[in-house]
Regions:
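Short active-site oxyanion
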Residues: 56, 111-112, 129-132, 153-155, ...
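Conserved nucleotide-binding/hydrolysis micro-motifs of P-loop NTPases
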Residues: 28, 64-66, 138-141, 163-164, ...
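Short basic, glycine-rich beta-strand/loop surfaces that mediate nucleic-acid
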Residues: 153-196
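N-terminal targeting/trafficking signals and adjacent low-complexity tails
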Residues: 198-210
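Extended interfacial segments that mediate partner engagement and assembly in macromolecular machines
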Residues: 64-141
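N-terminal cysteine/histidine-rich coordination modules
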Residues: 1-81
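Helical mechanochemical/support elements of P-loop NTPase systems and associated helical scaffolds
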Residues: 17, 56, 71, 97, ...
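Short acidic, glycine/proline-enriched helix-loop-strand junctions
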Residues: 142, 147-157
Length: 210
C-alpha cells in the first residue's frame, strides 16, 4: 500500500529561473510557484501558465500560503496600491491547475503518448516505456503494482477521478491510464506537484507515489 500523505515529487527541473515568494520571501523555482498579475481593473488574476502580460507577483503553490497572502493584503502592500482579490482565490487556482493538467493529458492522448482502459494500458506497458500510471481516485481496485512490465522509475498518480479521466478519452469513465516517458510526463508531474499544494490534508484522493 502507498502512504496517504502527499509525497512531493523529486524530479529534475526544466525551468532554472527562480523568483521570490512575496509572502515568505523564500527564493523558489518558478515551477514551485504561482504567478499573479494585476488587470486594468486592479483585480489580481492567477496566471498558472505564466504567460499573461504585466508585472508578475509570485506565491508558493500552497493553499495556506495563497490564503494567508489574500487575507493579509500582501498584494496591496507589495504594489503600494489598493487591489482586489477573489474571495475564493485558492479554489480558483486549484481549478485552473486541474484544467491545465487535463489539457496536458489531452495533448498526450492526441500525440499517441497516452492510452486509457485496463486492457490498453496492459498492451502499452508491454511495448512502451511508461512514465506515469494514473489510477482513478474513486477506483475500488487495489492501488498496487498489479501489472508487470512497469518501469521502476514510473510514477503512480491518484489525483484524478474516473469521470475526469473519461473526459480525456470522450468516455463516461476511465479507471486506468498511462503516459509514456518523456516531455509529457515531465510537464504533467510538475503541474500535479503544484496542484497537490491545494488539496485539503484530509482529502485522500491526492498523491503521487512510486
Amino acid at each position: 500500500m502507498f502512504g496517504r500523505e502527499v509525497v512531493l515529487l523529486k524530479s529534475a527541473r526544466s525551468d532554472k529561473n527562480m523568483r521570490k515568494c512575496i509572502l515568505t520571501k523564500e527564493l523558489c523555482y518558478k515551477s514551485d510557484l504561482i504567478r499573479f498579475v494585476v488587470g486594468p481593473n486592479k483585480f489580481v488574476v492567477p496566471d498558472v501558465a505564466g504567460r499573461l502580460p504585466g508585472r508578475g507577483l509570485w506565491l508558493k503553490a500552497k493553499k495556506d500560503i495563497v490564503t494567508a497572502a489574500c487575507d493579509k493584503g500582501i498584494f496591496t502592500n507589495v504594489l503600494k496600491d489598493k487591489v482586489s482579490v477573489p474571495i475564493d482565490m485558492a479554489d480558483l487556482i486549484e481549478g485552473l491547475l486541474r484544467k491545465r493538467c487535463h489539457e496536458l493529458m489531452g495533448m498526450a492522448r492526441r500525440a499517441g503518448q497516452m492510452v486509457g482502459g485496463y486492457a490498453k494500458v496492459g498492451l502499452f506497458l508491454s511495448s512502451k516505456d511508461a512514465g506515469i500510471i494514473i489510477v482513478a481516485s474513486d477506483s475500488r481496485r487495489s492501488r498496487s503494482k498489479e501489472k508487470t512490465n512497469i518501469p521502476p522509475d514510473a510514477k503512480f498518480v491518484f489525483c484524478f477521478s474516473s469521470t475526469e479521466l473519461g473526459r480525456i478519452f470522450d468516455r463516461d469513465k476511465i479507471v486506468y491510464a498511462v503516459i509514456s516517458s518523456g516531455s509529457f510526463t515531465t510537464n504533467l508531474l510538475l503541474e500535479i506537484k503544484r496542484l497537490s499544494g491545494f488539496f485539503k490534508e484530509e482529502n485522500e484522493r491526492s498523491y503521487i507515489s512510486k
